[in-house]
């Protein structure tokens, strides 16, 4: 817990990684980078990345993929490219190996780069992309430990209610600029949109875990954004 408090005070925050079902443990173990982009054609952009794995190999990524915003978009073609690393040092170093604004023309013509961020996880997290509700929230440092613990409790309760593939992560930015600074990113992940909707239906029907969700919400100072993303892994170093 002391590590989490220190991270919060430094405006840092955490990932436990699992590429093809590998798991990376809590604070300090594992990190990832994201590049937020506007794609002219999301399918063509993803196809290009999938066909050019050397882009991810060159920066030492353990795994990589994409998330396409399907609801709550700020702009058309909103998506991100993510890549995972064994530690934050490797993630930071990767930023020196590739400049997204100096990409080959074949790639540059497919998208406009918005910004990049490095992330750390505050709780264990299984990298198993799917249909993901993504909340960006602001939480006071004095409430951070309680908030993370509430999410752990909520994740366990939803899994035990019959959603065995459900997964939650809470992450904080390094180098978030005006876009992400002092903001936590929470991901609630289900295999499909239907199952995600079923979980929401169960909440409104009085699910036993409802009070835990409400407890976590009470610890949030502000919800910055609320989107749904369709995510997939397109590269693995193994």
Model features per residue range: what roles?
Residues 19-238:
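Short S/T/G/P-rich N-terminal loop/turn motif that feeds into the first structured element of a domain
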Residues 13-19:
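C-terminal segment of classical bacterial N-terminal signal peptides
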Residues 4-13:
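Sec-dependent N-terminal signal peptides
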